[in-house]
């Protein structure tokens, strides 16, 4: 009981979360609560308990069992759907963290919009809608294009653009299907004003109420009317940071976020930056890894430090760019061939296939996991954003995926 350990709630999938576990384990011995016994997580953990992560009582019982065996120094999650559980546990044990009210406000986008408006943080007009008719009425007030989204989902699940009244039946069905799986922190669907302009996120670290904006992530989107994030690029010293940092800080204050890493999404509209949402955790799609490669700041390690009540090291040591780009199949069908053709790979940090030969490839986002359409991804680095994007384009152009619409016959 002499050593103090960091409790992780929900590890997530290894391809996108292993780097977070590695960094956290390098900072502190780890305990884990997850919905299955550890496999890939085992080298990083000292002890674990299994629990249904959607059941607050089960998670609390698992944490209490670990607390009886170990001295817990902090509680951390990078899973959007475990944020409330982590906040409640930190409060239960008197550990550093965000109060559940603040985390709940970040999770529920309807509450977020209310708090942004009260604090004069530029955001989007938003209305909770309970039916197709209510969505039509709200869209008439807001104007087209508009956006339908579940109130408390993540990963662009169920988020869809509505260009006209005739689009509403189809887009409402998409948003409603997504809302069925969003978790207890938010209910139903929001109809929101469409914010036109490039999408970015600000990666921040908050320690005892003081926020540092570490980096800007510039995003690429695709697959209209969906808002699929097809790529991200981080550049050290991005000049946009000085413009958007105060808005990100104001958004976190409005919600009451006082500790941890946050991923603050915005659109750069003609009227200036405006908030999309705040995720009170490290960004997905390896964004924390991009920040580390570009700036030298390790957000995963900083998250572990803050969770344990320690001052995070946010000193930049690199002056580069890093980018990730997603690979998609050319059509729907069965994957018959995949190959990364030879080329100049000195700037390629990592390439990962997500579909094997024989797998079904789709271009239709799922209502539970819209990134099901991805066939792979590449991470690259460069001396500038332009260089990184050029290197990324080269790698993705060399990635060959072929599909057939005919299911191969069994031998």
Which ranges hold each PLM region?
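A conserved helix-loop-beta module that forms one wall/lid of the active-site cleft
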Residues: 92-158, 165
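Peripheral (often C-terminal) accessory segments that flank ATP-dependent C-N-forming ligase machineries
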Residues: 30, 118, 304-411
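ATP-dependent carboxylate/phosphate-activation module, predominantly the ATP-grasp catalytic core
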Residues: 166, 192-257, 261, 268, ...
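Conserved ATP-binding module of the ATP-grasp superfamily
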Residues: 122-124, 145-148, 161-197, 216, ...
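ATP-binding N-terminal substructure of ATP-dependent carboxylate-amine bond-forming enzymes
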Residues: 1-102, 133, 359-360, 368-373, ...
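A short, glycine/Asx- and small/polar-enriched loop/turn
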Residues: 143, 268-274, 369-372
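Short, well-ordered beta-strand elements within core beta-sheets of diverse protein domains
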Residues: 160, 193, 236, 374-382
């Amino acid at each position: 009981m002499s050593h103090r350990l960091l409790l992780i709630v929900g590890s997530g999938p290894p391809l996108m979360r292993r780097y977070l576990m590695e960094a956290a384990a390098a900072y502190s011995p780890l305990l884990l609560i997850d919905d299955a016994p550890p496999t890939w997580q085992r080298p990083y953990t000292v002890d674990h308990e299994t629990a249904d992560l959607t059941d607050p009582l089960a998670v609390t019982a698992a944490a209490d069992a670990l607390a009886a065996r170990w001295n817990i120094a902090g509680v951390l999650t990078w899973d959007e759907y475990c944020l409330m559980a982590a906040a409640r546990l930190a409060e239960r044990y008197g550990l550093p963290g965000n109060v559940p009210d603040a985390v709940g406000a970040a999770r529920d986008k309807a509450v977020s919009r209310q708090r942004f408006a009260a604090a004069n943080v530029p955001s989007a007009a938003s209305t909770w809608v309970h039916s197709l008719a209510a969505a039509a009425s709200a869209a008439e007030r807001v104007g087209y294009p508009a956006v339908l989204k579940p109130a408390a989902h993540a990963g662009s699940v169920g988020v869809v653009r509505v260009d006209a009244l005739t689009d509403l039946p189809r887009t409402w069905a998409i948003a409603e299907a997504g809302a069925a799986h969003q978790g207890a922190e938010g209910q139903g669907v929001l109809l929101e004003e469409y914010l036109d302009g490039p999408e970015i996120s600000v990666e921040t670290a908050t320690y005892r109420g003081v926020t540092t904006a570490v980096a800007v992530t510039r995003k690429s989107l695709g697959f209209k009317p969906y808002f699929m994030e097809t790529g991200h690029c981080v550049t050290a010293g991005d000049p946009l940071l000085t413009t958007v940092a105060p808005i990100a800080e104001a958004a976190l204050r409005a919600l009451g976020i006082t500790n941890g890493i946050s991923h603050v999404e915005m659109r750069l509209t003609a009227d200036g930056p405006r908030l999309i949402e705040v995720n009170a955790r490290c960004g997905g799609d390896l964004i924390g890894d991009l920040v580390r490669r570009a700036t030298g700041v390790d957000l995963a390690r900083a998250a572990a430090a803050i969770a344990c009540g320690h001052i995070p090291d946010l000193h930049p040591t690199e002056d580069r760019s890093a980018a990730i780009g997603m690979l998609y199949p050319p059509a729907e069908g069965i994957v018959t061939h995949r190959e990364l053709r030879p080329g100049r790979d000195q700037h390629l940090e990592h390439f990962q296939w997500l579909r094997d030969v024989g797998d079904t490839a789709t271009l239709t986002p799922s209502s539970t996991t819209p990134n099901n359409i991805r066939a792979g991804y590449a991470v690259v680095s460069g001396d500038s954003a332009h260089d990184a994007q050029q290197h990324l384009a080269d790698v993705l152009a060399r990635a060959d995926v072929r599909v057939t619409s005919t299911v191969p016959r069994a031998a």
